[in-house]
Amino acid sequence: MVNYPHKVSKKINRTSPISSQRVNFANRGMSFEAAINDSNQYYLAHDIAVIHKKPTPVQIVKVDYPKRSRAKIVEAYFRQASTTDYSGVFKRHYIDFEAKETRQKASMPMKNFHAHQIEHMKQVVKQGGICFVLLHFSTLKETYLLPATHLIEFYQVDMGSKSMPLTFIRQYGFEIQMGRFPSIPYLEIVEKNLLGGESFENYNN
């Protein structure tokens, strides 16, 4: 069990060594989601991993049939996603993660996470999958990878009614130094810290 909200016995350096120079993907005209998608395209093109964004479910309300052989959707709306944003395979491991962004400087609102998403993450972790969240603080230009186990335990403390302090994220997560190719090199952290390092040994405990 982790001490909450931000008590740890020692300071741990959890910064990705990708680059000592911070690169802001926003300066390249990219949103956080676009940067993740761009990174996934890079991984796919270079035969590193196959990771895709899950389609948002759509509820069709009304359909017109201007011709017998054609159907035209005239009214529909997006439904709330039931799981997480991304999934795929990396080095024979199932990868599943959610991505969240905030303009706040000191915390990540837990209202951004829904109970069914937390439950999905629990199931992925239980089955041995690699599950995490990518958290981007746009004002600070900082991005972190937080293992799902820490998110789940924090969520269970107050059932998502509060915010997760940035101090907590910095202590239990891993900062991602932005790159150029890929824009968000999150898989290096996954490989180093979740597939072979000390963090992975306790990942599913």
Swiss-Prot record:
It catalyses: Endonucleolytic cleavage at a junction such as a reciprocal single-stranded crossover between two homologous DNA duplexes (Holliday junction). Keywords: Cytoplasm, DNA damage, DNA recombination, DNA repair, Endonuclease, Hydrolase, Magnesium, Metal-binding, Nuclease. One of its GO terms (biological process) is DNA recombination. Pfam families: RecU. Its EC number is 3.1.21.10. The keyword Hydrolase applies. It comes from the Bacteria. This is Holliday junction resolvase RecU. It comes from Streptococcus suis (strain 05ZYH33). The gene is recU.
